Protein backbone atom coordinates (compact mmCIF):
# COMPACT_ATOMS: atom_id res chain seq x y z
CA UNK A 1 0.00 0.00 0.00
CA UNK A 2 1.14 3.53 -0.80
CA UNK A 3 0.94 6.40 1.69
CA UNK A 4 0.21 10.06 0.99
CA UNK A 5 -0.67 13.05 3.12
CA UNK A 6 -3.34 14.30 0.72
CA UNK A 7 -5.09 12.48 -2.13
CA UNK A 8 -7.15 14.67 -4.46
CA UNK A 9 -9.87 12.96 -6.49
CA UNK A 10 -10.16 14.89 -9.74
CA UNK A 11 -7.65 16.82 -11.83
CA UNK A 12 -9.89 19.61 -13.05
CA UNK A 13 -9.70 23.27 -11.99
CA UNK A 14 -10.73 22.49 -8.40
CA UNK A 15 -8.29 19.61 -7.95
CA UNK A 16 -5.39 21.54 -9.48
CA UNK A 17 -5.95 24.64 -7.33
CA UNK A 18 -6.36 22.53 -4.18
CA UNK A 19 -3.14 20.63 -4.89
CA UNK A 20 -1.13 23.79 -5.51
CA UNK A 21 -2.51 25.38 -2.35
CA UNK A 22 -1.68 22.36 -0.19
CA UNK A 23 1.85 22.22 -1.61
CA UNK A 24 2.40 25.91 -0.84
CA UNK A 25 1.31 25.16 2.72
CA UNK A 26 4.28 22.80 3.22
CA UNK A 27 2.65 19.44 2.40
CA UNK A 28 4.92 17.29 0.23
CA UNK A 29 3.15 13.95 -0.25
CA UNK A 30 0.27 14.93 -2.53
CA UNK A 31 -1.34 12.81 -5.25
CA UNK A 32 -3.94 13.82 -7.85
CA UNK A 33 -6.04 11.01 -9.35
CA UNK A 34 -7.68 11.90 -12.68
CA UNK A 35 -9.83 9.55 -14.76
CA UNK A 36 -9.32 11.43 -18.05
CA UNK A 37 -6.23 11.20 -20.25
CA UNK A 38 -5.06 14.71 -19.31
CA UNK A 39 -5.38 17.26 -16.53
CA UNK A 40 -7.68 20.25 -16.85
CA UNK A 41 -11.13 18.72 -16.59
CA UNK A 42 -14.01 20.36 -18.41
CA UNK A 43 -11.91 23.44 -19.21
CA UNK A 44 -10.14 21.57 -22.00
CA UNK A 45 -13.30 21.71 -24.14
CA UNK A 46 -14.31 25.26 -23.13
CA UNK A 47 -12.40 27.10 -25.85
CA UNK A 48 -14.44 30.30 -25.48
CA UNK A 49 -13.09 33.24 -23.51
CA UNK A 50 -14.36 34.76 -20.26
CA UNK A 51 -12.20 32.84 -17.77
CA UNK A 52 -9.66 34.30 -15.36
CA UNK A 53 -10.98 37.83 -14.90
CA UNK A 54 -11.01 37.46 -11.11
CA UNK A 55 -8.04 35.12 -10.66
CA UNK A 56 -5.56 36.52 -13.20
CA UNK A 57 -7.15 39.92 -13.97
CA UNK A 58 -7.22 39.06 -17.67
CA UNK A 59 -9.54 37.24 -20.04
CA UNK A 60 -8.48 33.70 -20.96
CA UNK A 61 -9.95 30.69 -22.74
CA UNK A 62 -10.65 27.53 -20.76
CA UNK A 63 -7.52 25.66 -21.93
CA UNK A 64 -5.37 28.72 -21.19
CA UNK A 65 -6.80 28.99 -17.68
CA UNK A 66 -6.28 25.28 -17.01
CA UNK A 67 -2.81 25.44 -18.55
CA UNK A 68 -1.62 27.95 -15.96
CA UNK A 69 -2.63 25.68 -13.09
CA UNK A 70 -1.24 22.58 -14.82
CA UNK A 71 2.07 24.38 -15.27
CA UNK A 72 2.09 25.37 -11.60
CA UNK A 73 1.30 21.83 -10.45
CA UNK A 74 4.17 20.45 -12.54
CA UNK A 75 6.60 23.15 -11.36
CA UNK A 76 5.70 22.36 -7.75
CA UNK A 77 6.49 18.69 -8.37
CA UNK A 78 3.04 17.43 -7.42
CA UNK A 79 2.47 13.80 -8.40
CA UNK A 80 -0.54 12.89 -10.53
CA UNK A 81 -1.89 9.80 -12.28
CA UNK A 82 -4.05 9.97 -15.38
CA UNK A 83 -6.53 7.41 -16.73
CA UNK A 84 -7.11 6.41 -13.12
CA UNK A 85 -10.59 5.70 -11.80
CA UNK A 86 -11.29 5.95 -8.07
CA UNK A 87 -13.65 3.16 -7.06
CA UNK A 88 -14.05 3.58 -3.32
CA UNK A 89 -13.03 5.65 -0.30
CA UNK A 90 -13.06 3.82 3.01
CA UNK A 91 -12.84 5.73 6.28
CA UNK A 92 -13.63 3.09 8.89
CA UNK A 93 -10.63 0.78 9.32
CA UNK A 94 -7.09 1.38 10.44
CA UNK A 95 -4.47 1.25 7.72
CA UNK A 96 -1.22 -0.72 7.76
CA UNK A 97 0.64 1.99 9.68
CA UNK A 98 -1.91 1.87 12.50
CA UNK A 99 -3.48 5.25 11.78
CA UNK A 100 -7.06 6.07 10.85
CA UNK A 101 -6.09 7.05 7.32
CA UNK A 102 -8.61 7.06 4.51
CA UNK A 103 -8.16 4.12 2.14
CA UNK A 104 -8.63 5.12 -1.50
CA UNK A 105 -9.20 2.25 -3.92
CA UNK A 106 -8.47 3.05 -7.56
CA UNK A 107 -7.56 1.31 -10.79
CA UNK A 108 -5.76 1.97 -14.07
CA UNK A 109 -4.14 -0.02 -16.85
CA UNK A 110 -0.63 0.33 -15.46
CA UNK A 111 -1.14 -0.55 -11.79
CA UNK A 112 -4.37 -2.53 -11.97
CA UNK A 113 -6.41 -2.30 -8.78
CA UNK A 114 -4.47 -0.58 -5.99
CA UNK A 115 -5.00 0.98 -2.56
CA UNK A 116 -3.67 4.26 -1.17
CA UNK A 117 -3.70 5.36 2.46
CA UNK A 118 -4.22 9.11 2.83
CA UNK A 119 -4.39 11.30 5.90
CA UNK A 120 -6.72 13.62 4.02
CA UNK A 121 -8.88 13.32 0.91
CA UNK A 122 -10.11 16.28 -1.14
CA UNK A 123 -13.16 15.60 -3.30
CA UNK A 124 -12.95 17.54 -6.58
CA UNK A 125 -14.86 15.37 -9.05
CA UNK A 126 -16.89 18.16 -10.64
CA UNK A 127 -20.40 17.60 -11.96
CA UNK A 128 -22.28 15.87 -14.76
CA UNK A 129 -25.15 16.85 -17.01
CA UNK A 130 -28.73 15.78 -16.46
CA UNK A 131 -29.51 13.25 -19.20
CA UNK A 132 -32.65 12.77 -21.29
CA UNK A 133 -33.79 9.88 -19.12
CA UNK A 134 -34.25 12.23 -16.17
CA UNK A 135 -36.35 14.69 -18.18
CA UNK A 136 -39.29 12.44 -19.15
CA UNK A 137 -39.43 13.75 -22.72
CA UNK A 138 -41.94 11.75 -24.80
CA UNK A 139 -41.16 10.47 -28.28
CA UNK A 140 -38.77 8.00 -29.91
CA UNK A 141 -35.05 7.74 -29.24
CA UNK A 142 -33.52 8.65 -32.63
CA UNK A 143 -29.98 9.76 -33.35
CA UNK A 144 -29.35 13.47 -32.97
CA UNK A 145 -30.12 13.97 -29.27
CA UNK A 146 -27.07 15.13 -27.29
CA UNK A 147 -26.34 16.79 -24.01
CA UNK A 148 -24.87 20.24 -24.59
CA UNK A 149 -21.55 19.19 -23.04
CA UNK A 150 -21.27 16.17 -25.32
CA UNK A 151 -21.89 18.38 -28.35
CA UNK A 152 -19.30 20.82 -27.05
CA UNK A 153 -16.69 18.06 -26.85
CA UNK A 154 -17.59 16.76 -30.32
CA UNK A 155 -17.17 20.20 -31.89
CA UNK A 156 -14.25 21.61 -29.91
CA UNK A 157 -12.08 18.52 -29.34
CA UNK A 158 -13.16 15.70 -31.67
CA UNK A 159 -13.88 17.93 -34.67
CA UNK A 160 -17.34 16.55 -35.47
CA UNK A 161 -20.45 18.57 -36.30
CA UNK A 162 -23.49 17.14 -34.46
CA UNK A 163 -26.05 18.63 -36.83
CA UNK A 164 -27.14 21.52 -39.06
CA UNK A 165 -30.56 22.53 -37.69
CA UNK A 166 -30.55 22.70 -33.92
CA UNK A 167 -33.05 23.18 -31.11
CA UNK A 168 -31.73 23.59 -27.57
CA UNK A 169 -33.79 22.66 -24.51
CA UNK A 170 -32.63 24.45 -21.37
CA UNK A 171 -30.92 27.79 -20.95
CA UNK A 172 -28.03 26.79 -18.71
CA UNK A 173 -24.68 28.38 -19.46
CA UNK A 174 -23.44 25.40 -21.51
CA UNK A 175 -26.59 25.49 -23.65
CA UNK A 176 -26.27 29.23 -24.24
CA UNK A 177 -22.59 28.92 -25.16
CA UNK A 178 -23.33 26.03 -27.53
CA UNK A 179 -26.05 28.08 -29.25
CA UNK A 180 -23.33 30.57 -30.17
CA UNK A 181 -20.77 27.87 -30.99
CA UNK A 182 -23.08 25.95 -33.32
CA UNK A 183 -24.01 29.21 -35.07
CA UNK A 184 -20.34 30.08 -35.58
CA UNK A 185 -19.77 26.61 -37.04
CA UNK A 186 -22.49 27.18 -39.62
CA UNK A 187 -25.51 25.53 -38.02
CA UNK A 188 -28.92 27.17 -37.72
CA UNK A 189 -30.10 27.33 -34.10
CA UNK A 190 -33.87 27.52 -34.40
CA UNK A 191 -34.75 28.29 -30.79
CA UNK A 192 -33.65 27.90 -27.17
CA UNK A 193 -36.51 26.72 -24.93
CA UNK A 194 -36.54 26.98 -21.14
CA UNK A 195 -39.03 25.26 -18.84
CA UNK A 196 -38.79 27.91 -16.13
CA UNK A 197 -40.01 31.52 -16.45
CA UNK A 198 -36.39 32.70 -16.16
CA UNK A 199 -33.09 31.71 -17.74
CA UNK A 200 -30.78 29.32 -15.93
CA UNK A 201 -27.62 31.04 -17.22
CA UNK A 202 -25.69 34.22 -16.63
CA UNK A 203 -27.13 37.44 -18.04
CA UNK A 204 -23.93 38.13 -19.97
CA UNK A 205 -24.24 34.76 -21.73
CA UNK A 206 -27.82 35.52 -22.76
CA UNK A 207 -26.66 38.78 -24.32
CA UNK A 208 -23.45 37.49 -25.93
CA UNK A 209 -24.75 34.10 -27.10
CA UNK A 210 -28.41 34.67 -27.95
CA UNK A 211 -29.18 38.37 -28.39
CA UNK A 212 -26.04 39.08 -30.45
CA UNK A 213 -26.94 36.24 -32.85
CA UNK A 214 -30.71 36.85 -32.95
CA UNK A 215 -31.46 33.43 -31.47
CA UNK A 216 -34.93 33.40 -29.86
CA UNK A 217 -35.34 32.35 -26.20
CA UNK A 218 -38.74 30.95 -25.25
CA UNK A 219 -39.30 30.90 -21.50
CA UNK A 220 -41.93 28.63 -19.89
CA UNK A 221 -41.67 26.22 -22.84
CA UNK A 222 -40.65 22.57 -23.08
CA UNK A 223 -40.37 19.74 -25.61
CA UNK A 224 -43.54 17.65 -25.75
CA UNK A 225 -42.69 15.46 -28.74
CA UNK A 226 -39.73 14.35 -30.83
CA UNK A 227 -40.38 13.37 -34.44
CA UNK A 228 -38.17 10.84 -36.18
CA UNK A 229 -37.21 7.19 -35.81
CA UNK A 230 -33.68 6.87 -37.21
CA UNK A 231 -32.73 10.56 -36.93
CA UNK A 232 -34.40 13.57 -35.34
CA UNK A 233 -36.66 15.23 -37.93
CA UNK A 234 -38.25 17.86 -35.71
CA UNK A 235 -39.52 18.65 -32.24
CA UNK A 236 -42.72 20.11 -30.84
CA UNK A 237 -42.56 22.82 -28.18
CA UNK A 238 -45.44 23.81 -25.93
CA UNK A 239 -45.92 26.51 -23.34
CA UNK A 240 -46.26 25.35 -19.73
CA UNK A 241 -48.39 26.65 -16.87
CA UNK A 242 -47.29 27.56 -13.34
CA UNK A 243 -47.16 23.84 -12.51
CA UNK A 244 -44.88 23.15 -15.52
CA UNK A 245 -47.66 21.24 -17.30
CA UNK A 246 -47.98 21.75 -21.10
CA UNK A 247 -50.84 24.04 -22.12
CA UNK A 248 -52.99 22.46 -24.82
CA UNK A 249 -53.19 24.50 -28.00
CA UNK A 250 -49.79 26.19 -27.61
CA UNK A 251 -47.80 23.57 -29.54
CA UNK A 252 -45.26 24.74 -32.14
CA UNK A 253 -43.34 22.43 -34.48
CA UNK A 254 -39.69 23.14 -35.35
CA UNK A 255 -37.92 21.24 -38.11
CA UNK A 256 -34.45 20.18 -36.93
CA UNK A 257 -31.96 17.32 -37.04
CA UNK A 258 -30.41 17.88 -33.61
CA UNK A 259 -31.72 18.43 -30.09
CA UNK A 260 -29.26 19.62 -27.44
CA UNK A 261 -30.17 19.26 -23.76
CA UNK A 262 -28.90 21.80 -21.24
CA UNK A 263 -31.16 21.02 -18.32
CA UNK A 264 -28.97 21.35 -15.30
CA UNK A 265 -25.80 19.97 -13.74
CA UNK A 266 -25.56 17.44 -10.91
CA UNK A 267 -22.51 17.21 -8.59
CA UNK A 268 -20.72 13.88 -9.16
CA UNK A 269 -20.91 12.34 -5.69
CA UNK A 270 -21.12 8.59 -6.18
CA UNK A 271 -17.62 8.24 -4.69
CA UNK A 272 -18.56 10.55 -1.81
CA UNK A 273 -21.35 8.15 -0.85
CA UNK A 274 -18.85 5.31 -0.44
CA UNK A 275 -17.10 7.43 2.21
CA UNK A 276 -20.44 8.02 4.01
CA UNK A 277 -20.31 11.74 3.26
CA UNK A 278 -23.58 13.51 4.06
CA UNK A 279 -25.15 15.18 1.00
CA UNK A 280 -27.33 18.27 0.86
CA UNK A 281 -30.65 17.34 -0.84
CA UNK A 282 -30.86 20.79 -2.49
CA UNK A 283 -27.35 20.98 -3.99
CA UNK A 284 -26.71 17.20 -4.25
CA UNK A 285 -23.25 18.08 -2.91
CA UNK A 286 -21.60 17.42 0.47
CA UNK A 287 -22.60 19.30 3.60
CA UNK A 288 -19.48 21.21 4.70
CA UNK A 289 -18.34 23.56 7.45
CA UNK A 290 -16.34 26.79 7.21
CA UNK A 291 -13.18 24.78 6.40
CA UNK A 292 -14.96 22.96 3.53
CA UNK A 293 -14.69 19.77 5.59
CA UNK A 294 -17.50 17.23 5.33
CA UNK A 295 -19.10 15.31 8.18
CA UNK A 296 -16.28 12.75 7.75
CA UNK A 297 -13.16 14.15 9.49
CA UNK A 298 -10.32 14.69 7.03
CA UNK A 299 -12.51 14.59 3.92
CA UNK A 300 -12.87 17.97 2.21
CA UNK A 301 -14.85 19.04 -0.86
CA UNK A 302 -14.55 21.94 -3.31
CA UNK A 303 -15.64 23.07 -6.74
CA UNK A 304 -18.65 21.77 -8.66
CA UNK A 305 -18.76 18.54 -6.67
CA UNK A 306 -19.79 20.73 -3.73
CA UNK A 307 -22.28 22.95 -5.57
CA UNK A 308 -22.48 24.16 -9.15
CA UNK A 309 -20.57 27.41 -9.69
CA UNK A 310 -21.04 30.16 -12.26
CA UNK A 311 -17.38 31.07 -12.67
CA UNK A 312 -14.27 28.89 -12.58
CA UNK A 313 -12.52 31.73 -10.74
CA UNK A 314 -14.77 31.04 -7.74
CA UNK A 315 -13.98 27.33 -8.04
CA UNK A 316 -10.26 28.10 -7.83
CA UNK A 317 -10.79 30.41 -4.86
CA UNK A 318 -12.80 27.78 -3.02
CA UNK A 319 -10.34 24.99 -3.89
CA UNK A 320 -7.40 27.08 -2.70
CA UNK A 321 -9.12 27.40 0.67
CA UNK A 322 -9.84 23.65 0.75
CA UNK A 323 -6.18 22.85 0.03
CA UNK A 324 -5.04 25.17 2.82
CA UNK A 325 -7.48 23.70 5.35
CA UNK A 326 -6.53 20.15 4.35
CA UNK A 327 -2.86 21.03 4.87
CA UNK A 328 -3.65 22.41 8.33
CA UNK A 329 -5.52 19.19 9.14
CA UNK A 330 -2.48 17.11 8.19
CA UNK A 331 -0.05 19.30 10.13
CA UNK A 332 -2.26 19.28 13.24
CA UNK A 333 -2.83 15.55 13.08
CA UNK A 334 -6.56 16.10 12.84
CA UNK A 335 -6.74 17.89 16.19
CA UNK A 336 -9.03 20.90 16.40
CA UNK A 337 -9.64 23.58 18.98
CA UNK A 338 -12.83 23.07 21.00
CA UNK A 339 -12.95 26.70 22.12
CA UNK A 340 -15.17 27.92 19.31
CA UNK A 341 -18.91 28.00 18.91
CA UNK A 342 -20.46 26.03 16.06
CA UNK A 343 -23.19 28.07 14.41
CA UNK A 344 -25.61 26.58 11.90
CA UNK A 345 -26.56 28.56 8.79
CA UNK A 346 -30.22 28.55 7.76
CA UNK A 347 -31.43 29.39 4.24
CA UNK A 348 -34.96 30.76 4.16
CA UNK A 349 -37.13 33.45 2.60
CA UNK A 350 -36.18 32.79 -1.01
CA UNK A 351 -32.64 31.47 -0.40
CA UNK A 352 -32.40 27.83 -1.56
CA UNK A 353 -29.19 26.76 0.18
CA UNK A 354 -25.93 28.01 1.63
CA UNK A 355 -22.35 26.77 1.44
CA UNK A 356 -21.03 26.25 4.08
CA UNK A 357 -23.81 24.91 6.32
CA UNK A 358 -22.05 25.55 9.64
CA UNK A 359 -19.35 27.88 10.96
CA UNK A 360 -17.08 27.25 13.95
CA UNK A 361 -15.70 30.54 15.22
CA UNK A 362 -12.49 28.88 16.45
CA UNK A 363 -11.73 27.36 13.05
CA UNK A 364 -12.74 30.22 10.75
CA UNK A 365 -10.46 32.92 9.38
CA UNK A 366 -11.14 36.59 10.07
CA UNK A 367 -13.87 36.38 7.43
CA UNK A 368 -16.01 33.59 6.00
CA UNK A 369 -17.63 33.71 2.55
CA UNK A 370 -21.08 32.14 2.36
CA UNK A 371 -22.33 31.43 -1.17
CA UNK A 372 -25.95 30.75 -2.08
CA UNK A 373 -28.59 30.86 -4.80
CA UNK A 374 -32.09 32.28 -4.73
CA UNK A 375 -35.15 30.33 -5.82
CA UNK A 376 -36.77 32.92 -8.09
CA UNK A 377 -36.12 36.27 -9.76
CA UNK A 378 -36.09 39.15 -7.26
CA UNK A 379 -35.91 42.85 -8.11
CA UNK A 380 -34.99 45.70 -5.75
CA UNK A 381 -34.79 43.40 -2.74
CA UNK A 382 -32.43 43.06 0.19
CA UNK A 383 -30.12 40.27 1.26
CA UNK A 384 -30.60 40.12 5.03
CA UNK A 385 -28.25 38.30 7.42
CA UNK A 386 -29.23 37.66 11.04
CA UNK A 387 -27.33 36.13 13.95
CA UNK A 388 -30.22 34.80 16.02
CA UNK A 389 -32.34 37.98 16.34
CA UNK A 390 -29.52 40.45 15.63
CA UNK A 391 -29.24 41.87 12.11
CA UNK A 392 -25.67 41.70 10.75
CA UNK A 393 -26.19 42.79 7.15
CA UNK A 394 -28.96 44.34 5.04
CA UNK A 395 -27.74 44.91 1.48
CA UNK A 396 -29.86 45.99 -1.47
CA UNK A 397 -29.65 44.20 -4.82
CA UNK A 398 -31.31 45.51 -7.99
CA UNK A 399 -31.73 42.01 -9.46
CA UNK A 400 -31.15 38.47 -8.19
CA UNK A 401 -31.83 35.34 -10.24
CA UNK A 402 -31.36 31.58 -9.74
CA UNK A 403 -28.82 31.49 -12.57
CA UNK A 404 -26.35 33.73 -10.73
CA UNK A 405 -24.68 32.79 -7.47
CA UNK A 406 -24.71 35.33 -4.64
CA UNK A 407 -22.46 35.63 -1.61
CA UNK A 408 -22.12 37.37 1.73
CA UNK A 409 -18.95 37.81 3.77
CA UNK A 410 -19.27 37.26 7.53
CA UNK A 411 -16.90 38.92 9.99
CA UNK A 412 -15.48 36.76 12.78
CA UNK A 413 -15.48 39.64 15.27
CA UNK A 414 -19.24 40.05 14.82
CA UNK A 415 -19.87 36.37 15.51
CA UNK A 416 -17.75 36.09 18.66
CA UNK A 417 -19.29 39.20 20.20
CA UNK A 418 -22.58 37.36 20.72
CA UNK A 419 -22.85 35.05 23.71
CA UNK A 420 -23.96 31.52 22.81
CA UNK A 421 -24.91 32.17 19.16
CA UNK A 422 -27.03 29.42 17.61
CA UNK A 423 -28.13 30.26 14.07
CA UNK A 424 -27.17 32.50 11.18
CA UNK A 425 -30.17 33.16 8.94
CA UNK A 426 -29.82 34.38 5.35
CA UNK A 427 -32.97 35.45 3.55
CA UNK A 428 -34.41 37.81 0.95
CA UNK A 429 -36.50 40.73 2.17
CA UNK A 430 -38.71 43.02 0.11
CA UNK A 431 -37.70 46.66 -0.26
What label would you give each PLM region?
Residues 1-9, 66-165, 241-249, 260, ...:
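FAD-binding core/adjacent interface of flavoenzyme oxidoreductases
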Residues 4-68, 72, 76, 153, ...:
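Beta1-alpha1 glycine-rich phosphate/pyrophosphate-binding loop at the start
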Residues 73-106, 183-270, 366-399:
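A Rossmann-like FAD-binding core segment of flavoenzymes
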Residues 114, 120-217, 224-227, 231, ...:
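Predominantly flavin-linked oxidoreductase catalytic cores and closely associated redox partners
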Residues 123, 145-155, 258-309:
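FAD-site-proximal beta/loop scaffold in flavoenzymes
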Residues 383, 413-431:
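Short, aromatic- and glycine-rich surface loops/edge beta-strands on solvent-exposed regions
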Residues 403-415:
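Exposed aromatic-hydrophobic patches
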